[in-house]
Amino acid sequence: MKLNLYVLTPKRIIWDCEVKEIILSTNSGQIGVLPNHAPINTAVDMGPLRIRLLNDQWLTAVLWSGFARIVNNEIIILGNDAELGSDIDPEEAQQALEIAEANLSKAEGTKELVEAKLALRRARIRVEAVNWIPPSN
Amino acid sequence: MSCSHLSTAWSSSALASSASTTRRRSPPRSGLLVRCSLRELRTRIDSVRNTQKITEAMKLVAAAKVRRAQEAVVSSRPFSEALVEVLYNMNQEIQTEDIDLPLTRTRPVKKVALVVLTGERGLCGSFNNNVLKKAETRIDELKQLGLQYTVVSVGKKGNAYFQRRPYIPLERDLEVSSVPTVKDSQAICDLVYSLFVSEEVDKVELLYSKFVSLVRSDPIIQTLLPMSPKGEICDVNGVCVDATEDELFRLTTKEGKLTVEREKVKIETQPFSPVVQFEQDPVQILDALLPLYLNSQILRALQESLASELAARMSAMSSATDNAIELRKNLSIAYNRQRQAKITGEILEIVAGADALAG
């Protein structure tokens, strides 16, 4: 059995292939989706999307909040933006993380603090997506 | 004796010719009557030719960019289609429930935010002026209705315009990149979202140029917030268009000419869907979904506005090129006429000299 996975953003289609399994971050925690999953609607939180390909390889993508719908072995994920792990430059992501940490320590005021925390979280997720090691099985 | 006379005649002719060449005359005073030296005419013709090359190049660049803008709209269609379908299904499933969402909450309107999309550069005919005139008209209407208003300006031309008019309250002026991105639309989306949810304004309207054809684009006003839970798109008069109808413009070549076909695509919504669980509260899910829809609407408006601007620039540069060609032709005629007159004059002088010598 397979799952049809679509990851759509206003800019382009990020993913449009059959997969074996995905692990998705939702607003109420991470969920794993295998074939014949119950129909479900969920809001997607900022976080990684793990994709297990048909050849048992794992890929990582990064989602920035959105919506996911799982019906009849078809997964539609809508988000404002998304990135495949392979498209992220590790050095650039690491630098962005360090810059975000520096900005957080320098932030003054509530608004700046909230923005700095969000930027830091975003940078951290991107770094994790690049450095993630898939489970061996 | 004879040889000496001949030498004198040639010298006299040369002097006259030199005087004629260096004499300066007044600039042209009537339409086609050109009076200036041949050198000045030559310089002017070269200058017009350079201008023509520039305007022609700009026209071709604008045409290429229109095509690219079209591709951007096409590539964002899958997202819009999926979003509308999901929104439709969601509403079917939770129809019986009484949902209170911040983005769909309707209040008595006391203050309106007007988001105005203009271009980043000029040289595109009356594109920017049309949008700004429409904005002024809308502002006057709001004044007559006794409503407060504030303006969110997007694009350099609009920013410059509103900054020169302190009497118009400007909430924010934003600049976008030359090609609309999700980041740009998200910035606008975040701003109008916070304005509306914090109840600073009760209604948000979006003013932009809708791309109709290569020679026409209409500034239209669309209500962004409050939005219908079903995702309908409403104009200021309350006329709603079903969101399942998605208009798409396409740049084609029909009989060797560039034309634009605008077709309506009916997005199919599945008639039956299984009972779907909600991982979170439906309100929370719609809270996540509607901002996506708002963002895609703004992005679409940015893309249409850019396409309109590029089409207007294409037309403007095409007209400028035609004008340059015509002007160059007229100047060439005047140049040749003057050159011919000069040569004729010189010949007459030579003949007169010869006659005098013979006499």
UniProtKB/Swiss-Prot annotation, chain A:
It is a peripheral membrane protein. CDD domains: F1-ATPase_delta. Produces ATP from ADP in the presence of a proton gradient across the membrane. This is ATP synthase epsilon chain, chloroplastic. SUPFAM superfamilies: Epsilon subunit of F1F0-ATP synthase N-terminal domain. It holds the Pfam family ATP-synt_DE_N. Keywords: ATP synthesis, CF(1), Chloroplast, Hydrogen ion transport, Ion transport, Membrane, Plastid, Thylakoid, Transport. It comes from the Eukaryota. GO terms for cellular component: chloroplast thylakoid membrane; proton-transporting ATP synthase complex. Its main location: plastid. GO terms for molecular function: ATP binding; proton-transporting ATP synthase activity, rotational mechanism. Coiled coil: none annotated. Belongs to the ATPase epsilon chain family. Transmembrane segments: none annotated. One of its GO terms (biological process) is proton motive force-driven ATP synthesis. It comes from Sorghum bicolor (Sorghum). It is found in: Plastid, Chloroplast thylakoid membrane. F-type ATPases have 2 components, CF(1) - the catalytic core - and CF(0) - the membrane proton channel. CF(1) has five subunits: alpha(3), beta(3), gamma(1), delta(1), epsilon(1). CF(0) has three main subunits: a, b and c.
UniProtKB/Swiss-Prot annotation, chain B:
Keywords: ATP synthesis, CF(1), Chloroplast, Disulfide bond, Hydrogen ion transport, Ion transport, Membrane, Plastid, Thylakoid, Transit peptide, Transport. One of its GO terms (biological process) is proton motive force-driven ATP synthesis. Belongs to the ATPase gamma chain family. Residues 1-35 form a transit peptide. The active site is at C124. One of its GO terms (cellular component) is chloroplast thylakoid membrane. This is ATP synthase subunit gamma, chloroplastic. SUPFAM superfamilies: ATP synthase (F1-ATPase), gamma subunit. PANTHER family: ATP SYNTHASE GAMMA CHAIN, ATP SYNTHASE GAMMA CHAIN, CHLOROPLASTIC. Produces ATP from ADP in the presence of a proton gradient across the membrane. The gamma chain is believed to be important in regulating ATPase activity and the flow of protons through the CF(0) complex. Inceptin is a proteolytic fragment produced by insect larvae that previously ingested the protein. This peptide mediate plant perception of herbivory through the induction of volatile, phenylpropanoid and protease inhibitor defenses such as ethylene, jasmonic acid and salicylic acid for example. F-type ATPases have 2 components, CF(1) - the catalytic core - and CF(0) - the membrane proton channel. CF(1) has five subunits: alpha(3), beta(3), gamma(1), delta(1), epsilon(1). CF(0) has four main subunits: a, b, b' and c. InterPro entries: ATP_synth_F1_ATPase_gsu, ATP_synth_F1_gsu, ATP_synth_F1_gsu_CS. The keyword Ribonucleoprotein does not apply. GO terms for molecular function: proton-transporting ATP synthase activity, rotational mechanism. Disulfide bonds join C234-C240. It comes from the Eukaryota. It is a peripheral membrane protein. It comes from Zea mays. It is found in: Plastid, Chloroplast thylakoid membrane. Pfam families: ATP-synt.
